[in-house]
């Protein structure tokens, strides 16, 4: 069983000064308010109510931390970080300013952050705000993995087109950098449970979870007799 299934709520942060003073790796989840971010986190962790999904898009304007650790372990081995959804028009100007500052400062300056899972609706990838998030994060030199959510809403050919175009945009970003990080993408559907294992492997690798390490094959050489 994936250690992600053991994820538990840890804390909510509304100011950078309140970020946990920890040293373990973190994986952040970002996306527009209607991209299915909370639902995807819940299904990756095989839980129904881990990440809260507000009935009003854009309502959640703080950062939620979830620990990843074996049962009864004294300390976490990593954190999943649910960032505020962005792009909802009805959020007030002052709240939006604070919220965007919190987002940009966290993704640009958090040294514990190992990678960014960026969720985009497969029907509308790379909106202006999605591009802004990528451009905030790229200078860190850390990887981005795009989940094209709600893939069940598209035909097979439209999904293939969306994935191809997304990978091209990522390749264009990489071409502008001297030493680009890994910029990858996949199709994802919480409803159809599509792409879950692929996304779990990415997150587990970034958190250096034991499940991400290849199994060590036993030696075929018999033990040398002692004495």
From Swiss-Prot:
Pfam families the record matches: MMR_HSR1
Domain EngB-type G: 23-209
GO cellular component, one term: cytosol
Annotated positions binding GTP: 31-38, 58-62, 82-85, 149-152, 185-190
Keywords from the UniProt entry: Cell cycle, Cell division, GTP-binding, Magnesium, Metal-binding, Nucleotide-binding, Septation
Keyword Metal-binding tagged: yes
Binding site for Mg(2+): 38, 60
GO MF term list: GTP binding; metal ion binding
Superkingdom field: Bacteria
Entry cofactors: Mg(2+)
Gene3D superfamilies, sorted: P-loop containing nucleotide triphosphate hydrolases (3.40.50.300)
Function: Necessary for normal cell division and for the maintenance of normal septation.
Similarity-based family: Belongs to the TRAFAC class TrmE-Era-EngA-EngB-Septin-like GTPase superfamily. EngB GTPase family.
Protein name: Probable GTP-binding protein EngB
Source species taxonomy: Bacteria, Pseudomonadati, Pseudomonadota, Betaproteobacteria, Burkholderiales
């Amino acid at each position: 069983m994936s250690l992600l299934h053991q994820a538990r709520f840890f804390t909510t942060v509304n100011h950078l000064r309140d970020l946990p003073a920890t040293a373990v790796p973190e994986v952040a989840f970002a996306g527009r308010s209607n991209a299915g971010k909370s639902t995807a986190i819940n299904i990756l962790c095989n839980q129904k109510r881990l990440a809260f999904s507000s009935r009003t898009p854009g309502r959640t304007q703080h950062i939620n931390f979830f620990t990843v650790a074996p049962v009864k372990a004294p300390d976490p081995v990593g954190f999943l970080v649910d960032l505020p959804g962005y792009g909802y028009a009805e959020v007030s100007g002052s709240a939006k300013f604070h919220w965007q500052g919190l987002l940009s400062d966290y993704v640009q300056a958090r040294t514990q952050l190992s990678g960014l899972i960026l969720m985009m609706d497969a029907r509308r990838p790379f909106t202006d705000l999605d591009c802004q998030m990528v451009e905030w994060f790229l200078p860190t030199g850390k990887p981005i993995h795009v989940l094209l959510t709600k893939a069940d809403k598209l035909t097979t050919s439209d999904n293939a087109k969306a994935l191809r175009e997304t990978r091209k945009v990522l390749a264009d970003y990489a071409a502008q950098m001297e030493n680009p990080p890994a910029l990858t993408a996949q199709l994802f559907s919480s409803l159809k449970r599509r792409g879950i294992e692929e996304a779990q492997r990415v997150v587990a690798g970034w958190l250096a979870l034991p499940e991400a390490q290849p199994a060590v094959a036993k030696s075929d050489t018999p033990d040398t007799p002692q004495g």
